[in-house]
UniProtKB/Swiss-Prot annotation:
Isoform JM-A CYT-2 and isoform JM-B CYT-2 are expressed in cerebellum, cerebral cortex, spinal cord, medulla oblongata and eye, but the kidney expresses solely isoform JM-A CYT-2 and the heart solely isoform JM-B CYT-2. Isoform JM-A CYT-1 and isoform JM-A CYT-2 are processed by ADAM17. Proteolytic processing in response to ligand or 12-O-tetradecanoylphorbol-13-acetate stimulation results in the production of 120 kDa soluble receptor forms and intermediate membrane-anchored 80 kDa fragments (m80HER4), which are further processed by a presenilin-dependent gamma-secretase to release a cytoplasmic intracellular domain (E4ICD; E4ICD1/s80Cyt1 or E4ICD2/s80Cyt2, depending on the isoform). The modification Phosphotyrosine is found at Y875, Y1035, Y1056, Y1150, Y1162, Y1188, Y1202, Y1242, Y1258, Y1284. Tyrosine-protein kinase that plays an essential role as cell surface receptor for neuregulins and EGF family members and regulates development of the heart, the central nervous system and the mammary gland, gene transcription, cell proliferation, differentiation, migration and apoptosis. Required for normal cardiac muscle differentiation during embryonic development, and for postnatal cardiomyocyte proliferation. Required for normal development of the embryonic central nervous system, especially for normal neural crest cell migration and normal axon guidance. This is Receptor tyrosine-protein kinase erbB-4. Residues 1-25 form the signal peptide. Belongs to the protein kinase superfamily. Tyr protein kinase family. EGF receptor subfamily.
Amino acid sequence: MKLATGLWVWGSLLMAAGTVQPSASQSVCAGTENKLSSLSDLEQQYRALRKYYENCEVVMGNLEITSIEHNRDLSFLRSIREVTGYVLVALNQFRYLPLENLRIIRGTKLYEDRYALAIFLNYRKDGNFGLQELGLKNLTEILNGGVYVDQNKFLCYADTIHWQDIVRNPWPSNMTLVSTNGSSGCGRCHKSCTGRCWGPTENHCQTLTRTVCAEQCDGRCYGPYVSDCCHRECAGGCSGPKDTDCFACMNFNDSGACVTQCPQTFVYNPTTFQLEHNFNAKYTYGAFCVKKCPHNFVVDSSSCVRACPSSKMEVEENGIKMCKPCTDICPKACDGIGTGSLMSAQTVDSSNIDKFINCTKINGNLIFLVTGIHGDPYNAIDAIDPEKLNVFRTVREITGFLNIQSWPPNMTDFSVFSNLVTIGGRVLYSGLSLLILKQQGITSLQFQSLKEISAGNIYITDNSNLCYYHTINWTTLFSTINQRIVIRDNRRAENCTAEGMVCNHLCSNDGCWGPGPDQCLSCRRFSRGKICIESCNLYDGEFREFENGSICVECDSQCEKMEDGLLTCHGPGPDNCTKCSHFKDGPNCVEKCPDGLQGANSFIFKYADQDRECHPCHPNCTQGCNGPTSHDCIYYPWTGHSTLPQHARTPLIAAGVIGGLFILVIMALTFAVYVRRKSIKKKRALRRFLETELVEPLTPSGTAPNQAQLRILKETELKRVKVLGSGAFGTVYKGIWVPEGETVKIPVAIKILNETTGPKANVEFMDEALIMASMDHPHLVRLLGVCLSPTIQLVTQLMPHGCLLDYVHEHKDNIGSQLLLNWCVQIAKGMMYLEERRLVHRDLAARNVLVKSPNHVKITDFGLARLLEGDEKEYNADGGKMPIKWMALECIHYRKFTHQSDVWSYGVTIWELMTFGGKPYDGIPTREIPDLLEKGERLPQPPICTIDVYMVMVKCWMIDADSRPKFKELAAEFSRMARDPQRYLVIQGDDRMKLPSPNDSKFFQNLLDEEDLEDMMDAEEYLVPQAFNIPPPIYTSRTRIDSNRSEIGHSPPPAYTPMSGNQFVYQDGGFATQQGMPMPYRATTSTIPEAPVAQGATAEMFDDSCCNGTLRKPVAPHVQEDSSTQRYSADPTVFAPERNPRGELDEEGYMTPMHDKPKQEYLNPVEENPFVSRRKNGDLQALDNPEYHSASSGPPKAEDEYVNEPLYLNTFANALGSAEYMKNSVLSVPEKAKKAFDNPDYWNHSLPPRSTLQHPDYLQEYSTKYFYKQNGRIRPIVAENPEYLSEFSLKPGTMLPPPPYRHRNTVV
């Protein structure tokens, strides 16, 4: 009670200024309905707002305040007292909303059909400007709708307001006030406000007008006592109990008094029992009663409206524009031929006839010529459809002339003009207003409604079959004595009479327009509407009439139809009925007795007696009655008032209480039975589940089990060396793995989860481990193991050359076409494997492809990858960061990811390679990418790409996902291109392009700077035997080459494998040029017989073996090596390029002569082991076979110019005669060639065991299914990557500066 008293003390200070003023002083302005739309110029937006609402008190419509800057003066809004629609305050930057005098929001129209007051997003994201206070200190009433206050960063005190006191219907669905406003950093209300205020001072306390009222008040109040109730017509509070003390009116304001309705235009006169015109009538205009509607409004009944409804027409009576019901068709004026929109038209034709639909008045002329009726081929106008001429049935007036010189042959009259009343003749055709010429098929005119031809003459000639024209007295149609008639050369009158073409006998002597009683100019006896009849239905018939002269008029609808032989009525109106069909009120028949009709001083209520006559109710009955006494008054419980005596109400109350208790008991029993049945049903379902649980799975999927194994590593086996980078979940270190109980050192990458991350990050971290451990492919990074220390660690193989994006950018001057296309094939094969395993990558890009060696790349970063279930076709992602510029359009719009969306990303990745690390859509804001793609624009064609390569990219960027190629097709397409790379990629100096040395990479050098890798072993070489059930290869011991040796002890023995003509491979996997330079190798399980010693370069040594005819299969004993060496296995990515094939193996393993055959599938390139001992003190690493020490050094030949270049696949112009293996023999290295082998990576090429080489299909199966590689690179934090954008930042309203778009390309 103290709270209420304190508030009312403050509220009393405002009462004097808050009462309703007469409507004459109210300044009314129109509202808007633009919602969040605004003008492009903010200055113009502010000026428009000020122009609308300056000096405005009542807003007839919606008050919308949007997109106003912080420095604008909004003091003009203080004059607004009332809003009939909704109030919208959004997207503004000002601090204070000065609607200090706003009392009531009526909510006749709601924002989003729900809110009468909506205030949101009123702050500037990149600044400190925003709405801080709501100056609504006098707002006390919202009649309809709820309140929405949200996302106002700096707004204070809104959460202290008692909104239930303001909103008339405070349902939970109408109230929204969330914590995104600035409530946490705001001050407290003044102590006199008791916790509810609009601002910090005592002048901003909220005034309560409903929740503090006494129970007896049925509305607002101005104090806590019973005597302080406001009048029931008050809204928003009051200063006293009268209807003139209201702050605002619930319904209408009549000169300062709040009333239920405005004084009506007609009032019931109890003396005459008639509705009479009320001279004190007023019209409803919004919530006000006005004597006269505004000049731009019209009167409809007793209201001011903007336009008449479709069933009424606007007329002016006594200087007042009013809406009157249309007697027939509401008028519509149209332009005639030669006027207005038809100024250039010469006739009515098929191109313009539709413009005359529903026309009642033709402003101009109607002309019918042969080019309109039968068509105009010259102007490509078709003949008119005769049915369309019926549009003229609505025409009542033609202000000009009617010219008919052509008519459809199947129409014998002009009945389409049956409603034509007047031909004005304001424009004449050679002095004529009606012209009908040479219409041979016309038999009658049938202008049955024509009453006047205001000006001009009549010309009707040469109509050989026209009759009835001679019966008409044409002069009765004329308005002046100067008008003439020319009617000749039509059908003779006697011929018409002979054929019975005469007027109906009911027509008078004035004539007729055609046959039948409806064509008479006037009737001989009686008429009903337009039809002449013999007599009226006075005593019989379906409906009864009375005679009004010669016109039969139907009796009033309130007259009861009498028996045959008795009159139903004596005249017009309900007071001339013989008997009433419903009730009789005085002399008038009415549909019901008056019930609440407004009288001169009060409302009229009557009841009907047993004779159905109406009598007045007792004066105490204010809601109607059933009889003459006060005990017969009608009582409505919801009004809160009763005129029944107390003794009459007691039984009703008792019956209501008993009935309510009975209903409550029934509801309680029903609820108990429902709960019991539900419990029993649940127990039965659980019993059935337990019975069948161990019998068979409930939902067998049929999916094969994932038998991938996860290696758990101890923390003591790992040593962290150097930080490589930081990611969203943790940090990546370069490290060393020393397996427990062994002496080998394996370089690895260690990804450690941050200690501050939560459980969700741990789950996502392990999900990534699951996916990486399940993948097994030479071009996918796979997990080596997991260390379950307090901070989870993922251990992967260390990639020595970093990501492909940085690699191509660093070596763009040394990368040729062959290598680019090889990478395209490898990435496609990796993605094809993912598609076979039903895994969607979702983040394929050049930054997520790592380089193990220049010839071998691997796909990594499975942080966004998702496995699909057996029956899933797509994955729908939740919110989060996304690489927008690499994503397909369906991913951006619907977050729907499929294998075909990965194809889109693959196309962007290829574009990055072909531009040597170019940024896609560089300079374009990420938020503009979706619109750009929808308009058809794509990445431009890279300069080095031919149209063949670019079209493959374009196919990857098709909007329809099903139209994009599959990864299998992409792998095959780029394999075909890789066989002839210079045909598809045009790179200047491609023939002389030198592949960068594996050790030249900056990333690789940084890895080697801090750790001695002398004893390092690659992770794959350590782990592969555990993944293959194939015999381990046998190796010879490795020694150093004596650089002073110049002779060869033995020539290399021959061995065979399918090879290209431009290189050969030793049996250990090494490569050599035509000059015979040895390459890194690994031994196979077979030995080869010795060959004769060759002189000079090693190429000469091979000449003998090449030309000795058929070579034989080598046989030699095995040599055992240590266990660490036996872990090494064949690299799955070894392949033999197919340019210039020399031959193929026969059944015994020998090479057959070369012959034409189809090109083999493009296989994976040879891969080096990046971690071997480096050269020290200028010494060259020795080949393992000591017999190479006898090689002699001869003078270099002219073709030795390539000897110092890296030897990779498909990079040589010359071809070697044949390919041979070398075993147990030594090649000498010429002095000039020593430096070609400074890079230790060149000494470590490997091939699979011989059994694998003899079966290429077997090799391909293993390389696809079992080999896997690991990587230690982690993707950077998503928020730091500018190519990622969150879902929220793509919403409308996100403001980003639009940099110039330098390269655009459009796909048609």
